[in-house]
Regions:
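N-terminal loops that bind phosphate or other acidic moieties
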Residues: 2-140, 144-374
Length: 374
């Protein structure tokens, strides 16, 4: 570690996004700006993070200056309207794709848990492969659909047929009519493999499955969740008859079951936060940096179980690295220094009105508190 005797420290600033207000890159910049007003001699390393959901591609792009952005106009959004898909091509030929960008819930005018699909994701994957991508890194999270990744597989060449041999409708509800799947024209995965980044251990079906765990946030009432769960079970049976797959694999329920569909295609489910930490260089900072500053919109008990901030804190503990957590709201006490923007601003409303400013204030407060412990 860098010696604190010299009066300066190495500080890794590695927050998640503050959903609905600031991107991870914006949070990192604001925290660093505030920190520098108190400890101007510290070496600040800005490493915005993500866990596979919103902000995944931007986090990787911020640490890979040689990455090249690609656009795929006219792909099918989750509700059928056209949108533009974006993906990042890294120097080694890996395509980084974020499901939330072209198949995410924010793209919906109104929730449609049974009708929304992942077709756009599949179209972007197909475009990346056609462009020569040698490997895929797909962030799963923030999806609008509960279609098991059926839409993505269809865009990759699979045919989902009812008992009369007709194509079924898009969306999770359409899976109820599924009788067979033709994978004869399914595009092969790239030679370098497919990594599926997820922050959940949800399985495909049942009380701990995609429909029941994530259905409520997509607007599905209890009856709809039951219906979608049965439809996903039908999909699993039909796909399992053609491809090796496991609906009970942890993470299969990610992104409305897209983890299941793309793992059947050949993808490998991996913990998103840990993989992004590796890709961005954060993993190398544990034990090297004197302190890691992380954060998210709300820090609570669930933050410590599989989420990005919990993963960062676990790595800090394992390497005896000091930690700071900055959150819009602290609903639980972090193991190191914890700072709430709502407390600093006097209310959640005030913090949300000027989040960047309060992140700068939090950065300064964090630096002062840390200095007082040295």
């Amino acid at each position: 570690m860098t010696s604190t005797d010299a009066g300066s420290m190495r500080v890794a600033v590695a927050p998640d996004s503050f959903k609905g207000s600031l991107t991870a890159t914006e949070v990192a910049a604001a925290l660093a700006a505030g920190w520098s007003t108190v400890r101007p001699n510290d070496e600040l390393v800005l490493l915005p993070q993500a866990d596979g959901g919103e902000g995944t591609v931007d986090a990787v792009a911020s640490c890979h200056g040689t990455g090249v952005w690609r656009e795929v106009p006219g792909v099918r959004g989750p509700d059928g309207r056209p949108t533009t898909g974006r993906w990042l091509l890294l120097r080694d030929g890996t395509a980084v794709i974020e499901l939330a960008q072209m198949s995410g819930l924010p793209l919906m005018d109104s929730p449609d848990p049974g009708g929304a699909s992942t077709t756009g994701l599949g179209q972007v994957i197909a475009a990346a492969l056609a462009d020569g991508a040698k490997a895929l890194l797909v962030g799963l999270g923030g999806s609008a659909s509960t279609d098991g990744g059926a839409g993505a597989l269809r865009a990759l060449g699979a045919k989902l047929l009812d008992r009369d041999g007709r194509e079924i409708p898009d969306g999770g509800d359409g899976l109820a009519a599924l009788d067979s799947i033709d994978v004869g024209s399914l595009i092969e995965p790239p030679p370098g493999g497919v990594e599926l980044l997820t922050d959940t251990t949800a399985v495909l079906c049942g009380p701990h499955g995609a429909a029941h765990v994530f259905g409520p946030q997509k607007g599905a009432d209890p009856a709809e969740r039951d219906r979608l769960d049965r439809a996903l079970a039908t999909f699993a049976a039909c796909l399992g008859a053609r491809l090796p797959c496991s609906p009970d694999e942890p993470g299969a329920g990610a992104a409305g079951g897209t983890g299941f569909g793309l793992s059947a295609w050949g993808g490998r489910l991996v913990p998103g936060a840990a993989r992004i930490a590796e890709l961005t260089g954060l993993s190398a900072e544990f034990g090297r940096a004197d302190v890691v500053v992380t954060g998210e919109g709300q820090f609570d008990a669930t933050s410590l179980s599989g989420k990005l901030v919990g993963s960062v804190l676990e790595r800090c503990a394992g390497t005896a690295t000091r930690s700071v957590v900055v959150a819009g709201r602290l609903a639980a006490a972090p193991p190191g220094i914890g700072i709430s923007l709502s407390d600093l601003a006097g209310s959640s409303e005030s913090a949300l009105a000027e989040p960047a400013m309060w992140c700068r204030v939090a950065g300064a407060v964090a630096a002062a508190r840390l200095t007082s412990t040295l």
